[in-house]
């Protein structure tokens, strides 16, 4: 067992509970009735980022749902990594197709089943925990910034204006996106570019 595996094993109960606390919040950006849940999820993320060791974690207003910004500056002259993720999720309907409650995580066959466990709370949580491990073990060599938005599932309508307004705050040398695909369960992939959204309407007759 390597040092990372030992760290996970020693902290697994708390790690799982922290992740589950995020998943339990129904942060559905497409439904206005979940407005309060969006804020609750952003605030929970800010709390977890502070616990991970960032210098500051802010829940910042945007034209829509709040955006979480956090940073850890280890050396003003070092390179800076900006981690992008989103905390909003899609609606869970049709509920009758779920074997368990979508916002009550359940572990089955070694997998976490819940809305947001994969897209995108799970991936972003892993990156925050990786940051925490590096920081606690004196291995963090770069500055790290985090930006977590709450509107990715509806096309990120507020993100561009937010980034334009906060250029200096978000300045970085490289961006790490935690919301891309894998070619297979045992075959990680590296996505080097994203081109936005495209929509088609297909009508089939006959």
Positions of the model-derived regions?
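Short coil-to-beta-strand
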Residues: 15-18, 101, 198-201
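Beta-strand secondary-structure signal
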Residues: 20, 69, 145, 199-203
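Fold-independent oxyanion-binding glycine-rich loops
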Residues: 63, 85-87, 109, 117, ...
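Active-site metal-coordination/substrate-binding segment of hydrolases
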Residues: 78-148
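Short glycine-aspartate micro-motif
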Residues: 80-82, 173-177, 199-201
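Acidic/histidine-rich catalytic neighborhood of metal-dependent amide-processing enzymes
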Residues: 118-193
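Flexible glycine/proline-rich, aromatic-decorated loop/lid segments
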Residues: 189-205
């Amino acid at each position: 067992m390597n040092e990372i595996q030992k760290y996970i094993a020693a902290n697994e109960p708390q790690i799982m509970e922290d992740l589950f606390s995020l998943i339990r919040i129904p942060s559905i950006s497409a439904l206005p009735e979940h407005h309060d849940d969006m804020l609750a999820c952003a605030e929970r993320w800010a709390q977890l980022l502070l616990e991970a060791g960032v210098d500051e974690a802010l829940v910042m207003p945007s034209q829509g749902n709040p955006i979480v910004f956090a940073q850890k500056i280890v050396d003003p002259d070092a390179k800076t990594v900006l981690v992008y993720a989103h905390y909003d999720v899609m609606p869970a309907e049709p509920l009758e197709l779920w074997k368990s409650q979508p916002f009550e995580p359940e572990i089955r066959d070694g997998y976490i089943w819940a809305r947001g466990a994969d897209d995108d709370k799970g991936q972003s949580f892993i990156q925050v925990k990786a940051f925490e491990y590096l920081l606690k073990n004196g291995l963090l060599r770069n500055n790290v910034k985090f930006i977590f938005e709450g509107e990715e599932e509806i096309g990120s309508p507020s993100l561009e204006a937010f980034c334009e307004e906060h250029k200096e705050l978000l300045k970085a040398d490289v961006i790490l996106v935690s919301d891309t695909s894998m070619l297979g369960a045992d075959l990680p992939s590296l996505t080097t570019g994203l081109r936005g959204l495209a929509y088609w309407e297909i009508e089939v007759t006959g």
